[in-house]
Structure formats: structure tokens, C-alpha cells
Amino acid sequence: SGNLAVEAEVERIEVLIKKEMTDLDAAEGWIKDNSKWDSIADHWLRIGAHYKGVDAEVNLKKHNSLIANLLYLIDDLAYAHHLGKLGLIEATYANWRNLLFIAEYIGQARALGMGVVSKGFCSSVLRIQLNHLLVKIESNISPSWTESTQQDFRTFLKVIKEQVITDTPSITPAEYFKLATGCIEHVLSEFDRKVEKIQ
């Protein structure tokens, strides 16, 4: 979005991702031989080298493509380790996989919303895109999540409706980024809990 208010947070996340990728590159086994992983690592390096020089829409498309490829890699991982064949997790497989898609919807809403609140303007195209994501996120809020998590999601969705998809967006980029990131973290924590049950 070109907003400098969250630049430090973006750089912090870049460092974390770089560490995780280095750890994965050093790991032995299945991922070393997976061409999708090589492609993802290369794609990430190219994004990291050029994201500051391209506009937000191009960055969003590149990140969406990267995330889609990560989700395919996770499917390959589940298949390679026969996770779908274990009776106890067949029912939960779609559930933990769905959590990753929810995180992606929130990530897209975060990226689009950051563009809106940074510019102080929401175009009709962005309203449609954000409303579409809002519906996807809202329909996936699970009653099994803690009340505080559900409340954070309701707050985030209310902010999108009332402070982002308006003629004059009224939330600061830093506040919006923090709200969206908090929801992503809730979903990823839930994902971690589901995966721990499988292990």
C-alpha cells in the first residue's frame, strides 16, 4: 500500500519468514525433493527483492499467488504423509485446511484495506472486493472458537463495514493492520492446535 506506518512490522515479518525458510531449507526429508517448495522459495526471494518498487495491486497479486502455492504444498505434504488415510483425522482434515483459507481471506482483506486506509479513499471495485472477503470471513467464524476470538473477528468485520468501506475511511493504517493481524494470528493458533492433535 506504500504506507510507511507499518514498514517496521513488515520488516519484522520478513525476518521471521526468512528464518523459517532457512530452517526448512536445512531440513532433511520430503520437502528437499519437492519442486513446489523450490518454486515458492524462489518466488518469495523475487517478491522480497522487488516489492518496494511495484504498486500495491501487483504486490497483492504476487502474494495471493504465493499463498495459493503454499496451500498446494500443504496439500502435497498431507498426501505424502498419508494424513487423509488416518481415520481419526479424516473429518478434521477439511477443518484445519479451511483455517488456512480463512487466514488467506483475512490477509487479502488486510492488504486491500491497508491500501484504502492509507489513501483515505475506497473505490467501488475495492468495496466489492472487501465485501466479498467480508462475507467469506464472516461465514467461517466458528462457534467453537473462544468468545474473545469471535469478538475480535466481529470487531474486525465491523471496522471493515463502518471505517474502511466508506466514503472517508476513518481508521489509521496501523490500527487496521493490528486488528487484521490479530485475527490472522487467532486462526493460525487454531490451526496449530488442530495439527498438534494429528501429531
Question: Predicted segment positions?
Answer:
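Hydrophobic alpha-helical segments
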Residues: 1-199
